C-alpha cells in the first residue's frame, strides 16, 4: 500500500537531526521528521531539586510546548491561558521518563539537565520526534559537563498505527487523525522498551495486530538510533564555554559558568 506522501507502510519519514541550533544551550538539536520540526535544548545547572539533595544523584527533566502557529490554526500560548494543559503535562513527563532511561543519574553527579522541546511545526509525531531529538541534546550536554559516561544507552521513539485496516509506521497528521489504532513506542538503543502507549480509537485491536505494530516500531527505532549516532559522530557544533575542571579527562566537571 502506498500512502498519501508516497511512503510504504514500513517506511519512516525523512528524518534529520541538526546539532547546535542554540548557541547558548549546553546541548541542542533541531529534529525534522517529514514536515514536523522540534527544537530541543538542554540546559545544565549545578545542583538538584531540594528533595534530591545529598543523594549523589543528578536529575533530568523535560518541558514540551508548541508554538502558537505550529498547527493549521493558531493556539494561544498556555502562559496566556494561565494554566498548562493536561496534554502538555503528559508529554513533558513522557519525555523526561524516556530520557532518564538513557542516563546513569549517579554518574551525572548532583547536576540537573532540563530539556526544552518546542514544536516549530506539527505534522504528527511531535512527542516521538521530541524524544528522539532531546536525546541528542542530552548527550551533548553531558559531554559539555565532562560526564559523557553518564549516557548509558540511546533512546528514541516512533509512532505506529492502523489506518484503514493497515498497520503503518510513523504516522503523519492526516493518517494519525483518521487512525483506527494509534500507538507511541519508546525504545533504547540497547533494545529495551521504555514505554508503549496504544489506544484503539474505535474497534479494539487483536494481539496479532499489536505484535505487527511493535515489529514496525522496532524497525523504525533501529533506524532512528542510526540517525542519532550519525548526528553525534559529526564534529560538535560551537556552544557555550565548557566549565573549568580540576583535571583534564577527570570527569569531575559539573559546575556551570556562573553567567547563565
UniProtKB/Swiss-Prot annotation:
Its EC number is 2.7.7.56. The keyword Nucleotidyltransferase applies. Residues 232-260 are annotated as: Disordered. The keyword Transcription regulation does not apply. GO terms for biological process: rRNA catabolic process; rRNA processing; tRNA processing. Disulfide bonds: none annotated. Pfam families: RNase_PH, RNase_PH_C. GO terms for molecular function: 3'-5'-RNA exonuclease activity; tRNA binding; tRNA nucleotidyltransferase activity. It catalyses: tRNA(n+1) + phosphate = tRNA(n) + a ribonucleoside 5'-diphosphate. Homohexameric ring arranged as a trimer of dimers. Phosphorolytic 3'-5' exoribonuclease that plays an important role in tRNA 3'-end maturation. Removes nucleotide residues following the 3'-CCA terminus of tRNAs; can also add nucleotides to the ends of RNA molecules by using nucleoside diphosphates as substrates, but this may not be physiologically important. Probably plays a role in initiation of 16S rRNA degradation (leading to ribosome degradation) during starvation. Belongs to the RNase PH family. This is Ribonuclease PH. It comes from Parafrankia sp. (strain EAN1pec). The gene is rph.
